[in-house]
Amino acid sequence: MSSPAATATAAAAEGGRPGRVRARQRLIEACVSALHLYGPSRTTVSRVVSIAGLSPGIVRFYFNSKAALLVAALGFLADEFEERVLKPVAALKHSPVAALGLLVELYLDPEIASPRKVSVWYSFWGEASSRQEYLDICGQKDEDFARLVHELTETLIEQTGARHLDADGVALGLIGVLEVLWQGIAFQSEASLNRRALVARALAYLRSVFPGQFPGPAAPRRRTR
């Protein structure tokens, strides 16, 4: 009698392109989970297939090595970030207030910024100095994000006439705020996170730089004697 893992392997191998795509994605998702639990150096093929519920033999259909599987997992995260964050925000670039508000929401969304995925991003960054593939993918993601944030802040400065502001400094400040919030997410569980509070903290920075441009709690009224 075949095991469930062996049955899944056979189905993936014989199920045509849709089945192969699903099995490959299943391995990548399992690899992300393994990286979250064990880090790159302790993630093994056996741990990945165990999480995926597949047999070890299936890996050779899609990846010629553990290294190739890890690069595919990082590439998946980078593609997801581009599709779910960069592209929707860039589509609103002529409305920088709406675009920056959406950027904050999406950057801190649990689909992108789950403790699992954020911790994996940091794991890869930790290994990037010794792995050119990791450095290339992580670096490109950060460059694209920084370029978009700078473009949006520059446009907003022009539209509001706040020419005393420096676009580089404002963009760097927002990126820094979001980075600090991601660092906090990496070391917490989803149940302990207050997503609304995280978004509010990032928007508070934008309100402090561009008063009246971003919705938020009204300023407390000054008490009169």
Model-predicted segments: where are they?
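Solvent-exposed, amphipathic alpha-helical segments
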Residues: 26, 30-37, 84-88, 120, ...
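Helix-turn-helix
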Residues: 26, 30-68, 72
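N-terminal intrinsically disordered/low-complexity leader segments
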Residues: 1-22, 214-225
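Short, basic, alpha-helical segments at the C-terminal edge of helix-turn-helix-like DNA-binding modules
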Residues: 75-81
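Secondary-structure edge/capping motif, primarily at the C-terminal ends of alpha-helices
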Residues: 92, 125-129, 185-189
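Hydrophobic/aromatic-rich alpha-helical bundle segments in the mid-to-C-terminal region
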Residues: 133-139, 143, 156-225
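Amphipathic alpha-helical segments used for helix-helix packing
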Residues: 98-99, 113-136
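Hydrophobic alpha-helical connector segments
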Residues: 72, 86-117, 164-174, 218-225
